[in-house]
Amino acid sequence: MLLPIYLYGHPVLRKVAEDITPDYPKLKELIANMTESMYHSDGIGLAAPQIGLPIRVLVIDADPLKEDYPECAGFKRVMINAHIEERGEDLCTEYEGCLSLPAIHEKVERPTSIRIRYVDEDFQPHEEVLHGFAARVVQHEYDHIDGKLFIDHISPIRKQLIKGKLQNIIKGKVRTSYRVVTAPTGKRR
């Protein structure tokens, strides 16, 4: 089932998400719906807060980026209760976009490597060290479960320059190819 994407300005995007337990209701169905919604929206990642749930669930498929970023080849994950344990010292700046911030793309500086621990959809524990764009994608989605957005990492001047676009998103004056929920009333369209 396709789920609507919650847009910038909705309070759920600013909540720190909670860990879940293996008995979370209909978890497999939720993961399948999140994955379907991510693909339908042409995304490479989706976090549960982006569909209105303040829980620590991420779905990622960065494989479409493999031609430009070989480290993304086959990089498909479900990450539950993820926690970044360590961030590398080397930084890299790349453009990022977000389904919750349609039509906004900004340069974001992030560590080029991370160490993350999480459980998968079967609640099997994992710990991985990720590098390059795969690390960037995970950090971007991880921000969502910590109540952050990629625009929180840009300069005040850049934020000022996109202020009008952000206001339009809040007002629902934005076109998308996917269903959305806008702020502050949670109106669906």
Curated annotation (Swiss-Prot):
The keyword Iron applies. It catalyses: N-terminal N-formyl-L-methionyl-[peptide] + H2O = N-terminal L-methionyl-[peptide] + formate. Keywords: Hydrolase, Iron, Metal-binding, Protein biosynthesis. The active site is at residue 141. Its EC number is 3.5.1.88. Its cofactor is Fe(2+). It is an enzyme of class 3 (hydrolase). Binds 1 Fe(2+) ion. InterPro entries: Peptide_deformylase, Peptide_deformylase_sf. Belongs to the polypeptide deformylase family. Removes the formyl group from the N-terminal Met of newly synthesized proteins. Requires at least a dipeptide for an efficient rate of reaction. N-terminal L-methionine is a prerequisite for activity but the enzyme has broad specificity at other positions. This is Peptide deformylase. It comes from Porphyromonas gingivalis (strain ATCC 33277 / DSM 20709 / CIP 103683 / JCM 12257 / NCTC 11834 / 2561). The lineage of its organism: Bacteria, Pseudomonadati, Bacteroidota, Bacteroidia, Bacteroidales.
